[in-house]
Amino acid sequence: MSLIFKVMNRSYDDFMKESDPKVQPLMDSLRKFCFSLGSNVMEDIRMHRVVFCKSFAFRWFVDVEPQNESILLKIQKSRRETQTVELTLDQDLDKTQELIREAYNTIH
């Protein structure tokens, strides 16, 4: 039972220790961007991914899962509309950030 408790209460730093070092700077950039969207942004550290939500309704707007050489993002604008994006290490963040911003602004 204590193992389950520990996994469920992992910090972002603990999560990143298990991730490929190549994707860590990109993960950090995405995390910083998500928190910049508003004071109501919360992160939920899961076993293999980090989910960013609006706190008042705990509606997630982006699910971020590190891979070996990329990051897999599921961006949710509504309960019925989810877009999957694979972000490579050398890819420009501007378009992806705009998709995340739009999801944050439209999710209820």
Label each residue range with its predicted role:
Residues 1-108:
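Charge-dense, helix-prone N-terminal extensions
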